[in-house]
Amino acid sequence: GKIAGFQEKPKNPKTIPEKPDKIYASMGIYVFKHPVIEQELHDDARNSKSAHDFGRDIIPQMLKKGLKVCVYNFLDENKREAQYWRDIGAIDAYYEANMDLVQVEPIFNLYDKDWPIRTYQEQFPPAKTVFAGEEIPGRVGLVLDSIIPGGCIISGGKVIRSILSPNVRIDSFTEISDSILMEGVNVARYAKIKRAIIDKDVNIPEGMVIGYDLEEDKKNFFVTESGIVVVAKGTEI
């Protein structure tokens, strides 16, 4: 249906008529016609009083202009079952949502053909693991309970319960566990990483240890409330 009004995180939200204990909540999922959103973003950018936020500024302004803004129910009208949704506005929530994907039967299954993900897929060579511990004991390219895309090379290191982005290089005798590594990350020999998010284009030097001593990690990186270590994009270590 068409939206009559929009409030962003009000202290006393308006309730649903005849349901005083319930409210309609925005899930932050938007679909726009390109010319419309382009114009709205230009208008908002010129507004010095705007916080440049979709919920606080852009959507309410569209309603003031009388534009057609509609809302769609999260529930499946036929099955009456809620589909998958996670609020990933906080780093800890983002981490947990990603870790869900490496479960044996995740709630959100990337391999579900009924819910394909349509996005641009850059072409990379296949991922590969090298070294099987035959020449040097402990030098094993091993991946367990993890997701690794094209362009990745696991060269004698271990990746356990982790998610890698394209073009990640893991060198020998390293161990990556319960972590998220973004595109272009290189991890040198003997490094150990646990419960961390390593952003793009970070080079982890030889012997570096992240996630095992949070007090030490706090001196160099950001650590969330739940103990996830975040290494920012392009950080030089």
Give the residues covered by each predicted segment.
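Left-handed beta-helix
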Residues: 35, 44-237
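Conserved core of the sugar-phosphate nucleotidyltransferase
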Residues: 1-35, 39
